Amino acid sequence: MRLLLSILGVLTLLSILPLARSFLANQECFSEYRHCRMKCKANEYAIRYCADWTICCRVKKREAKKKIMW
């Protein structure tokens, strides 16, 4: 009986932790490269929702152009 209760307790704890982690996560976009908008621009991608249900957008990293040597 104790084993069953401990297994149920662990399962309950594991189901609560992701909810608490998402609740405690930072809900704002703090950076010069992140902005809350209704739609991301072509050079941005969505990260998360902001507090007012806008989308937190982050600028994509640019890939360096490779020169062909031959």
UniProtKB/Swiss-Prot annotation:
Coiled coil location: none
Main subcellular localisation: secreted
Keyword set, alphabetical order: Antibiotic, Antimicrobial, Defensin, Disulfide bond, Secreted, Signal
Record-annotated disulphide pairs: C29-C57, C36-C50
Cellular location(s): Secreted
Residues making up the signal peptide according to the UniProt record: 1-22
Any one of the GO BP annotations: defense response to bacterium
Gene Ontology CC, one term: extracellular space
Name of one Pfam family that matches: Defensin_beta_2
Superkingdom field: Eukaryota
Family that this chain belongs to: Belongs to the beta-defensin family.
PANTHER family reported in the protein's UniProt record: BETA-DEFENSIN 131A (PTHR47900:SF1)
Free-text function comment from the UniProt entry: Has bactericidal activity.
Name under which the protein is recorded: Beta-defensin 43
Provenance organism: Rattus norvegicus
